[in-house]
Amino acid sequence: MVLRSEILVNKNVMPTAEQALPGRDTPMSLPEFHYVFKDTPLLGPFFEGAIDFAIFGLGCFWGAERRFWQREGVVSTVVGYAGGFTPHPTYEEVCSGLTGHTEVVLVVFDKDKVSYRELLAMFWELHNPTQGMRQGNDIGTQYRSAIYCTSPEQLEQAKASRDAFQAELSKAGFGEITTEIDQAPTVYFAEAYHQQYLAKNPDGYCGIGGTGVCLPPSLQGN
């Protein structure tokens, strides 16, 4: 069995539920409104449009969130942690590798303006989904690629898009996709200072970078 001390040194190893930090019962305090969309409540309620939710992990959530809030049809974004064991973790706890969580962006979108398939195309093309427990220079389980689906339809579309993107990656000489695709677990929202971080700090770090490979146009639309 891998020991806790080994995970602290090698953050590419997922902890077990028994090894994970205990966390806490209290969620992080969040601002009421989205920093970019101003009058839009960060977590709703959302009264206009055909609202749906998507959850993506593609490396550091600062840069990922910015790319999604820039997309027409997205009405709100929130960053957080998901896929692990520790309830309501702090950023420092996630960075330790002892929570099992990956950094994610919860994307709130209007299906009449942008489809889930279009968001999936963005997801695949914005990062390198073949790198396992890392994304570029960001190394550890918290940077693993993930799609967490809020419905069976999303799960089906996510897997189909993965297979299509794998075909394109293979043609370009890339390896196998390591993206975790599953039904949505609990998303624990990150601390307030992480929300819309690059809008508050325009010169801040952004580790997002794709492979240059694109999905075929026929798979990018509705």
From Swiss-Prot:
The keyword Zinc does not apply. Keywords: Oxidoreductase. Transmembrane segments: none annotated. The active site is at C60. GO terms for biological process: cellular response to oxidative stress; protein modification process. It is an enzyme of class 1 (oxidoreductase). GO terms for molecular function: L-methionine-(S)-S-oxide reductase activity; peptide-methionine (S)-S-oxide reductase activity. The keyword Cell membrane does not apply. It holds the Pfam family PMSR. InterPro entries: Met_Sox_Rdtase_MsrA_dom (IPR002569), Met_Sox_Rdtase_MsrA_sf (IPR036509), MsrA_MetSO_reductase (IPR050162). Its EC number is 1.8.4.11. It catalyses: L-methionyl-[protein] + [thioredoxin]-disulfide + H2O = L-methionyl-(S)-S-oxide-[protein] + [thioredoxin]-dithiol; [thioredoxin]-disulfide + L-methionine + H2O = L-methionine (S)-S-oxide + [thioredoxin]-dithiol. GO terms for cellular component: cytoplasm. It comes from the Bacteria. Belongs to the MsrA Met sulfoxide reductase family. Has an important function as a repair enzyme for proteins that have been inactivated by oxidation. Catalyzes the reversible oxidation-reduction of methionine sulfoxide in proteins to methionine. This is Peptide methionine sulfoxide reductase MsrA. It comes from Pseudomonas putida (strain ATCC 47054 / DSM 6125 / CFBP 8728 / NCIMB 11950 / KT2440).
